[in-house]
């Protein structure tokens, strides 16, 4: 049987072209939008200058973000005071593997037209790793809507992703510093969730001093706003806690953890 070489060659070229096209389609699906490297870490410095960022939102439109009102910092009830659903997931240079938890920022937007241009304060309560901008705030629905003109909140949320500006500010929590002993704590294991710290808001070191001791022992950063200590011997309460904020401020809370402390219990500074 005669073979038409030209026809075969044309067919092969068509098949090769199809394969190449599929490769590019698959690569495009894998690669997605261009990734933007994170910016420099936002430190405990306070000025008048604003930085550019992207803003998105998640959860319920008028909610606190996570369905369980928690988040990557380990806080509970971020829908209640003093957070009041004004939480934000910071990207890498803002969340800082949990060391940015509790820090506070003023945010605002000028566009689209629904933006008020007036700053509102949000708290870092969660994390995001979406590489869409050097700085990215994934906001609770309530916090995103707070940047809008009155009555335009829902229209602004429909924008989905917008340009915004931000700057770090001192925290002014309307609550006392609270230490929550996490579930699983026992005589030889201490895990503290620290929250509502005025000023810098975020913590870089936690130390505890046992009853009758003059020496502070450091806790290790576990995750989010949680710090832990594994001890070879049972810890003797009451425990005094010393906090160091990112800006270097040290605060001491004498005997804040009682001798008969219990897991899954919050103790408030006097």
Swiss-Prot record:
Keyword terms: Allergen, Cell wall, Cell wall biogenesis/degradation, Disulfide bond, Glycoprotein, Membrane, Secreted, Signal
GO CC term, one of those recorded: membrane
SMART domains reported in the protein's UniProt record: DPBB_1
UniProt entry tagged with the keyword Cell wall biogenesis/degradation: yes
Topological category with respect to the lipid bilayer: Peripheral membrane protein
Disulfide bonds: 73-101, 104-171, 109-115
UniProt cross-references to Pfam families, sorted A to Z: DPBB_1 (PF03330), Expansin_C (PF01357)
Tissue expr: Expressed in pollen.
PROSITE patterns in the cross-refs: EXPANSIN_CBD, EXPANSIN_EG45
Entries under Gene3D superfamilies matching the protein: Expansin, cellulose-binding-like domain (2.60.40.760), RlpA-like domain (2.40.40.10)
Gene Ontology biological process terms from the UniProt entry: plant-type cell wall loosening; sexual reproduction
InterPro entries (UniProt xref): Expan_Lol_pI, Expansin/allergen_DPBB_dom, Expansin_CBD, Expansin_CBD_sf, LolPI, RlpA-like_DPBB, RlpA-like_sf
Signal sequence extent: 1-31
Record domain Expansin-like EG45: where: 70-176
Location(s), subcellular: Secreted, Cell wall; Membrane
Record: glycosylation sites: 41
Family (UniProt): Belongs to the expansin family. Expansin B subfamily.
Function summary: May aid fertilization by loosening the cell wall of the stigma and style, thereby facilitating penetration of the pollen tube. Acts selectively on grass cell walls, which are relatively poor in pectins and xyloglucans and rich in glucuronoarabinoxylans and (1-3),(1-4)-beta-D-glucans, when compared with cell walls of other angiosperms, including other monocots.
Name this protein carries in UniProt: Expansin-B10
Lineage: Eukaryota, Viridiplantae, Streptophyta, Embryophyta, Tracheophyta
């Amino acid at each position: 049987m005669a073979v038409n070489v030209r026809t075969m060659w044309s067919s092969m070229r068509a098949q090769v072209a199809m394969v190449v096209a599929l490769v590019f389609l698959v690569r495009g699906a894998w690669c997605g939008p261009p990734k933007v490297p994170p910016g420099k870490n936002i430190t405990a410095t306070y000025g008048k200058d604003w930085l550019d960022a992207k803003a998105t939102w998640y959860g319920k439109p008028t909610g606190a973000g996570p369905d369980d009102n928690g988040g990557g910092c380990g806080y509970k009830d971020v829908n209640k005071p003093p957070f009041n659903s004004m939480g934000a997931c910071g990207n890498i240079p803002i969340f800082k593997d949990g060391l940015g938890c509790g820090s506070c920022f003023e945010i605002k937007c000028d566009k689209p037209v629904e933006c008020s241009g007036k700053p509102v304060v949000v708290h870092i309560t969660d994390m995001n790793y979406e590489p869409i901008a050097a700085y990215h705030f994934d906001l609770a629905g309530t916090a995103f809507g707070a940047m809008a003109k009155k009555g335009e909140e829902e229209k602004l949320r429909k924008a989905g992703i917008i340009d915004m500006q931000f700057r770090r500010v001192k925290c002014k929590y309307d609550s006392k510093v609270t230490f929550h002993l996490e579930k699983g704590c026992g005589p030889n294991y201490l895990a503290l969730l620290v929250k509502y710290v005025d000023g810098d808001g975020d913590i870089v070191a936690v130390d505890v001093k046992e009853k009758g001791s003059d020496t502070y022992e450091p806790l290790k950063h576990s995750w989010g706003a949680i710090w832990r200590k594994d001890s070879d011997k049972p810890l003797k309460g009451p425990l005094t806690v010393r906090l160091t904020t990112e800006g270097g401020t040290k605060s001491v809370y004498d005997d804040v953890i009682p001798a008969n402390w219990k897991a899954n219990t919050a103790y408030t500074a006097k």
